[in-house]
Amino acid sequence: MSSLFPFIFLFLFSFLTSFRASAQDPRFLAYYCPNATTYSSNSTYLTNLKTLLSSLSSRNASYSTGFQNATVGQALDRVTGLFLCRGDVSPEVCRNCVTFAVNNTFSRCPNQREAVFYYEECILRYSHKNILSTAITNEGEFILRNPNHISPIQNQINQFTNLVLSNMNQIAIEAADNPRKFSTIKTELTALQTFYGLVQCTPDLSRQNCMNCLTSSINRMPFSRIGARQFWPSCNSRYELYDFYNETAIGTPPPPLPPLASPSLSDKSGNSNVVVVAVVVPIIVAVLIFIAGYCFFAKRAKKTYGTTPALDEDDKTTIESLQLDYRAIQAATNDFSENNKIGRGGFGDVYKGTFSNGTEVAVKRLSKTSEQGDTEFKNEVVVVANLRHKNLVRILGFSIEREERILVYEYVENKSLDNFLFDPAKKGQLYWTQRYHIIGGIARGILYLHQDSRLTIIHRDLKASNILLDADMNPKIADFGMARIFGMDQTQQNTSRIVGTYGYMSPEYAMRGQFSMKSDVYSFGVLVLEIISGRKNNSFIETDDAQDLVTHAWRLWRNGTALDLVDPFIADSCRKSEVVRCTHIGLLCVQEDPVKRPAMSTISVMLTSNTMALPAPQQPGFFVRSRPGTNRLDSDQSTTNKSVTVSIDDKSMSDLDPR
């Protein structure tokens, strides 16, 4: 009888929660804030913007059609906005997405006169410009790639490219001719594989403008992947080899939204129908859930795991779905051959692997003598499994086999940032524009962890070797073995076990075990200074009594010679105003008082807005004073038995960064 308890619990829990599934928050993808112009607090523009957003998210908005636009105000204070819901979603899902997007507008793009917010189910957009009936294809682009490549054989690549173009161009024509400016396609490739495509324009566009926008969108998609999507503010396109849209909703008129008021009790026949539905539907759902639960536990009992990683970027990942067969990983890495080794990460070696289906992966094999225990291992899996952001490396699976613990990640072509930044033979490949792009990408990734993901995550080990670079030199934050999850209202946590890397750790964490979002901000500041200078913080050669990079940068700033910090490889080609501003931001991040360090949301605005005034930086943490006998704080060393001389404010800190 006791063996039935898991099923009974699953049944009751699923029954009680199944009716709340539709109320989950929409999946946020990206936002675009050009920061060309801003508005001030209490301005007429802000008042008009609030009125506009209220109108777009009102109960009377056009959720059934999935599109609405509005304009509020006059002349320079005029603001125009719109929402566009994906053509296959229900009015209720549309309303939920738009309302959620409106409620998060000011936290994502504060004080911006123009913005676009991309969600899985909808797009929200506003601007001080006239954005209606105009196809925008030169700004606000966002691309998502399925991490799985198609076969490397050239003729298969050409065949697949032709297939994608043929199908996508066909539905682009259909969408342009459709009043809803929306179309999908389903094409069987083989008995086991089907192609799915979707395109959509905002319905205010003319046929020609919609066609031009979709043509641009489709041509910018990476056809080397088995799935991809591209967004412009005015249109978007997507293809996959799985069913990602609601086929039953295509071609049928959307049902009306459910009434917000209580129904009348006078219609007896109507009430009887409601009672029947209310009784029958939960029973059917409960039976299906029970069957699914039985299959789930039966599968667990067999202890059989996948032989290749699942790459469906839209499925919510579970620990069970991530567990891979050890022998498959062993074969993918040629039995962890030295020829496959591509580096060393936290707690173990990293190998390149290729699965039988052609998927390239990075395999981290944890050392058997590693300090990372089962807690950290499971923590890394749980933390990373459901994160979805282009500036975070994605976990594809894991394996536990006796003493072996293995993590499988997406393969990132250019390895880590430190391989370029600190190698005299390679650092010349990092032009200033690339370094500036990398700084911005890291900032967006940290902002997602701190604010935009479902959980508040503190990384605790941000450093150059944990920033990976893909084929286009886009940064991806990696190695979440030391990350911690915060509660919704939690701003700080203490620990007696200090983990991380010296030189990147904030003073309050290194000395008192206190960590918060501002600890990651400190690490980000050190990274920014390293990217600008091309020098490691811990290997700094003493100059003018400076014993680390942070101290050196602070003294140059204080002396008015900040440009002397710049890496000689980029000194003649960099934009000096951007370099100085980034140095300024880096020094704000490494200030000794954590309260005075800016939040990542503020940093993102600082990096993209040249009009935002920056406060003067104050003394950094671990600032080395010119006196004999000062111990040096080194990087990449154990934190035990290491004394340092620092100056730290002992008052408690609070983090005001909003979620």
UniProtKB/Swiss-Prot annotation:
Keywords: ATP-binding, Glycoprotein, Kinase, Membrane, Nucleotide-binding, Phosphoprotein, Receptor, Repeat, Serine/threonine-protein kinase, Signal, Transferase, Transmembrane, Transmembrane helix. It catalyses: L-seryl-[protein] + ATP = O-phospho-L-seryl-[protein] + ADP + H(+); L-threonyl-[protein] + ATP = O-phospho-L-threonyl-[protein] + ADP + H(+). It is found in: Membrane. One of its GO terms (molecular function) is protein serine/threonine kinase activity. Residues 27-131, 142-244 form the Gnk2-homologous domain. The active site is at D461. It is a single-pass membrane protein. The keyword Glycoprotein applies. Belongs to the protein kinase superfamily. Ser/Thr protein kinase family. CRK subfamily. Residues 626-659 are annotated as: Disordered. GO terms for cellular component: membrane. This is Cysteine-rich receptor-like protein kinase 7. Residues 1-23 form the signal peptide. The chain crosses the membrane at residues 274-294. The modification Phosphoserine is found at S465. Residues 636-646 have a biased composition (Polar residues). Residues 336-622 form the Protein kinase domain. It comes from the Eukaryota. Its EC number is 2.7.11.-. The modification Phosphothreonine is found at T501.
